[in-house]
Amino acid sequence: METFPHVFQYPFAVLQQQESGFPLRGRWHTDFFHNDHPIVLELGCGRGEYTVGLGKRFPEKNFIGIDIKGARMWAGAKESLQEGMSNVAFLRTDIELLDRFFAEGEVAEIWITFPDPQMKKVGKRLTGTRFLSLYDKVLERGGRIHLKTDSPFLYTYTKALVELNGLPVHEITDDLYGKGCVENEILGIRTYYEQQWLERGLTIKYISFGLGEPDCEYREPDIEIEPDSYRSYNRSRRSQAVPS
């Protein structure tokens, strides 16, 4: 992937060698995308099929898929390059370093698609307070966070956290495809991975919410949540997007 012009590989060891920091931080609009369209991130993008799917569906927005495992994103990077998609890029790095790659207010939306719910490690949950404070450093005021998950545990946890902290909720459903309460553009993008769980009878949960006031201290919900069977499913296959 070193030859792909829209793929940036900056794990922590590489970033440390850059005395001036990541060159596109605060300059994604002017120096890479060459437009002022909203920037949308997909965290833990895997093979990149959802990032590419969003890029096709929303040409008026810029999309950046982020994952630490570079081999995963090769498929999405190749497809977007072959199709000449100028609104898609990929970044190989740790999500914990997000503010080293994006300036304050540079990001309009964040997608978190089917992450590990981290049932035993609160600090690693991508919708937990630790990460919300990180997103605060890059997300514009009024920006949105989107979570799609098949994990009842993570959905319940995120819903409780949002309610406890009084965060604005834009859309929420515990059965995304069964109740049809969200915009069709979101329903129209399914990864193979997502389709697989639907065929097994799992429901997809979705919540779109905003952040709190600047510099607010987020609180963790003090509730007991029953663990789910997230680990019992084969999650190794994440291939092409499947149209609905």
UniProtKB/Swiss-Prot annotation:
Active site per UniProt: D116
Keyword tRNA processing recorded: yes
Binding site for S-adenosyl-L-methionine: E42, D67, D94, D116
EC main group: transferase
DNA-binding among keywords: no
Residues binding substrate: K120, D150, T191, Y192, Y193, E194
GO molecular function: tRNA (guanine(46)-N7)-methyltransferase activity
Any one GO cellular component localisation term in the record: tRNA methyltransferase complex
Alphabetical keyword list: Methyltransferase, S-adenosyl-L-methionine, Transferase, tRNA processing
Assigned EC number: 2.1.1.33
Pfam family, one: Methyltransf_4
UniProt feature coiled coil, ranges: none
Pathway where it operates: tRNA modification; N(7)-methylguanine-tRNA biosynthesis
Reactions listed under catalytic activity: guanosine(46) in tRNA + S-adenosyl-L-methionine = N(7)-methylguanosine(46) in tRNA + S-adenosyl-L-homocysteine
Family: Belongs to the class I-like SAM-binding methyltransferase superfamily. TrmB family.
Described purpose of this protein according to its UniProt entry: Catalyzes the formation of N(7)-methylguanine at position 46 (m7G46) in tRNA.
Annotated protein name in UniProt: tRNA (guanine-N(7)-)-methyltransferase
Taxon lineage: Bacteria, Pseudomonadati, Bacteroidota, Bacteroidia, Bacteroidales
Gene this chain is encoded by: trmB
